[in-house]
Amino acid sequence: MCLIKPACQLAGFYLLKLINSIVMLSLSSMNKEYNNVVLVIGNGFDLDLGLPTSYSSFIRSPYFDNHVSTTQKGSDTWNSPPGSEYLFDFLYSQIDWKDSRHLDAKKWVDIENELINFATRGNGMLSSSLEADEKEKKMFYLLQDELCNYLSNISYDNVNENSYAIKVLNSVNNLLGEIISFNYTDLSKLNQFLSNPLKVPIEYVHGKLADKTIILGVQDNVDFDPSYSFLIKTFSPHYKSHNVRKKLLNADEIIFFGHSLGNTDYHYFQELFKRQSNPDTAKDNLFMRIFTFDEESRRNILLQLREMNDKRTNFLFDLCDFELYRTKDKQDDTKIEGYLEALKKRIHQGLKKSRKGISCC
C-alpha cells in the first residue's frame, strides 16, 4: 500500500490551513491601519437638526399634558392622590413652570432622575408592593407609549440641511463608518437630506421608534424596592446587547455628537476614557471629537470626563488627538470645517487601503 499520496494530501491540507491563517493574520494587521469611524449621537444631535425631541418639548405637548390632572396644574407641589395616571402629576410637579429657563434646561437625563425620585419618594402612597407594581407599572408604560406617539408624529419639514449634524452624518456615511445612537428617532428619515442614503450599521441602544421598541427607565445601579424593577432599562423585553464598549475600544476615530456623557450612560464610556487617559493602556493614533452646544455644556462634559478618568483629563489630551467643539452660533465653525475636511481625507485613505487589501486577496 502506497503511503506517499495520503501523506502528500495531509501535508497539502495543513499547508492550506497555514496559508489561510497567514492571510487572515495579515488582513487583521492591515485592518488596524484602517480608519474605523464610530459616531455616537445623543439628543443634542436631533436638536442640532432642528427636531423638537427634547424632554421640555415632550412635556409641553398634549401627549404629556393631557394626562396631568387639573388639580396638579393649579399647584406648585405634588398633591395628586393615587390614580391611574399620577406619575404624570409627579413629573409635572418637578418643574418650575414659572421659570421658562428651568423648563428649557430640562434634559432626558432629568426624567431618569425623576423616575428614581418617584420610586424612592417614601411609603404610604400605596397599600402594598403588589399595588405599586400594577398601578405604577401601568402609568410608566402609558408614559412610554405617549413618548413614542409624540416622537412618531414630529415633523421633519424644518430639518436644517446645513447643520453640523448633517455634515457629520455625510462624513461617516461610508464603508468605514458606524453609528451608535442613544436617540429613539429613526435616522433613515434623514436620507432625503443626505448626499447618499445611509448605508452604515446603526445600533439603537435605547430601542427604535420605528418598531416601537423604545427603552425608557433607569440604570441597574439604582437601589429601590424590587416592585419597581419595571423601571430598570435592562428589565425591558426590548433590551439587548450592542457591544458599545467593544466598538469604542476598537475604533480608530470616535465622534460624540450631542451626548452629555452623563451618569445615566456613564457605564458605556467610562472604560474608554479611563484607558485613553493612561499612558500604559492608551490606544495609539486615536482621534476623538466631542460636539456639544455651548460653553456651559463644554465645561459640564469636561467635568464628566474628569470623573470617568480619575481626574486625568490632561492625559486624555496628550495621549490622543482630542478636541471639543461648540455648535452654538457657529462659535467653532473654522475648527469644525477644518476637522471635517481632515476626516474626509483620512476616510478616503482608509478606503483606498481597504480596496487594495481586498484586491490582493
Role assignments for model-derived ranges:
Residues 2-15:
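Positively charged N-terminal leader segments that act as targeting/secretion signals
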Residues 19-41, 45-49, 243-361:
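SIR2/sirtuin-family catalytic core signature
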Residues 49-50, 189:
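Short N-terminal helix/helix-N-cap motif within the alpha/beta-hydrolase-1
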Residues 51, 55, 59, 155-161, ...:
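Phosphate/oxyanion-binding active-site loops and adjacent basic polyanion-contact surfaces
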Residues 55-74:
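Short catalytic helix/loop segments, enriched in acidic residues and glycine
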Residues 55-59, 196-198, 272-273:
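Glycine-rich, phosphate-binding/catalytic loops in enzymes
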Residues 62, 191-196, 276-279:
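Active-site catalytic pocket residues across diverse enzymes, especially alpha/beta-hydrolases
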Residues 70-239, 250:
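Extended, H/D-rich, highly charged conserved domains that either
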